[in-house]
C-alpha cells in the first residue's frame, strides 16, 4: 500500500513495495519533495529544474525497488511467524515472498481462498479488518 497507513497505525518497519505517496521526486534530476509540495502545486507539480515531480510509487510496467524487495525477503526468511491477510496472492513478485518463509507458524486471514496453496497452521475466512479489530493487546 502506498498511503502510509501502516506507519500511522504504529508499524515500525514497513517495506513499501509499491512506494509511497508521501515521497515525490523529479523525473528529470531525481530531487525529492514531500507531499506538501505536491499539494500546494497548481496543476502538474514541477521541479526547480523544470522536470515533472512524480509520486514515488510504482506504476504499471515499472520495476520494484531491489533494496525494498531484499529487505522484505530477508524479514520474511528470518521470521518465526508470518501473518498473511487481505490478499489474493495473485500479484507477483509479492505473492512469491511466502516461499522464503522458514518459520514454524503461518496464519492466513482472508475473506476468500488465496490463489496460492498455503499450508497454514491457522486459517480464518473473514475480512481482515473485521478480525483484527477484535484483537485486544
Give residue ranges: language-model regions.
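Conserved catalytic alpha/beta core of Sir2/sirtuin-type deacylases, generalized to analogous enzyme cores
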Residues: 2-137
